[in-house]
Amino acid sequence: NVTSKKVKQSFTADELKIGDYFYSDGTWSDGGLRKIYTDGSMKIASPKPAPVLQTKSEIERRVIGIVFQTDPSRIGTAEKSKLGEGNVHGLVMALKNTATDIQWSHEENNLEDVKDCWSKSEIYSDISGLHNYTKILDHANSIGGIEAYPAFEAVEKWNDMYSINEYRPPRNTTGWFIPSSGQWWDILQNLGGCPAMADKGQQTSSDYGDFRWLGQGDVP
């Protein structure tokens, strides 16, 4: 019974929030989220709003991503530094993969500036994908080129502002990057609808090694 649930946060159509559509011109529109409950479940408007593919000025635009986080405390320092503390409003997951079946790297390296995450709490707390992405790019360039990191090379091709790629990022963004483990957590919790991800006990757990969640019900 939804009425028995405790509401954590409510939203109106004109507020930027999880699930909103993000467009090629850097704008966004309502994706239908109206309430988040304390158990991590959500209430979506019915009918769910459709993308608005034409601006009021009748200019065409494309959906290139979906907002998965707007909580400032879950947005990394590097992301905030890139655009300025007050200019970061949310994080967006791309609609399409840059590539499929592509290798992360041709080499194995433990970089000092990129944290190894083992426990659930470490995974949850690692929220700056842009930091990790930038440090790995710096390392790749220092050893002669990004070709040794195919996944990163694919992302950088998307970030090429002079390419004809339809998913290149708007100029008022950080550009695309590979999410950190904590950002993947937020994607699974906020867009994937996995109840365990919203559990404070899981977010602060010291469990590490190989583990998996079972019996989480249907994912929307």
Task: Report each predicted region and the residues it spans.
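Short, compositionally biased
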Residues: 2-172
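An exposed tryptophan-centered "aromatic clamp" motif
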Residues: 144-177, 181-220
